[in-house]
């Protein structure tokens, strides 16, 4: 099982989502910024590194928001999603096709990676009424 970390980044009442590039599996599906944990890294170190690589901005890693295991045809992952804040600057599209900030009510308008399904339901249940 591959350890994966991701960031739940809020800006006011909207959270950040990133669209996977055409060149990767699950092309053009939406996801949270993040990636695989490398050997010797803590989860927080991995998340900060992935954010710098993918969006050009580091993050202040907060508490765990959700954890989920998911089996894809090509990989089995354990995804840990952390509450996080951008540590300076605006996100840039260094690896993704697009970056957006959306409200929980806008989730149905986007095709997310299947591993994010339960996490998105938790976001709606905890934050959906605050719009």
Model-predicted regions and their roles:
Residues 124-131:
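Generic C-terminal helix-cap and adjacent flexible tail
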Residues 1-16, 36:
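Conserved N-terminal beta-strand and adjoining loop/helix that marks the start
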Residues 24-29:
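A conserved beta-turn-beta hairpin within the catalytic core of GNAT-like acetyltransferases
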């Amino acid at each position: 099982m591959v350890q994966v970390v991701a960031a739940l980044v809020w800006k006011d009442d909207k959270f950040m989502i990133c669209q996977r590039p055409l060149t990767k599996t699950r092309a053009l599906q939406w996801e949270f910024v993040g990636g695989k944990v490398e050997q010797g890294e803590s989860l927080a170190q991995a998340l900060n590194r992935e954010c710098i690589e993918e969006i050009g901005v580091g993050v202040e890693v907060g508490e765990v928001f959700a954890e989920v295991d998911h089996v894809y045809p090509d990989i089995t992952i354990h995804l840990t999603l952390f509450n996080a804040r951008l540590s300076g600057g605006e996100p840039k599209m260094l690896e993704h096709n697009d970056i957006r900030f959306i409200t929980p009510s806008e989730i149905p308008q986007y095709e997310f990676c299947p591993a994010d399904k339960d996490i998105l339901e938790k976001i709606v249940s905890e934050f959906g009424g605050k719009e």
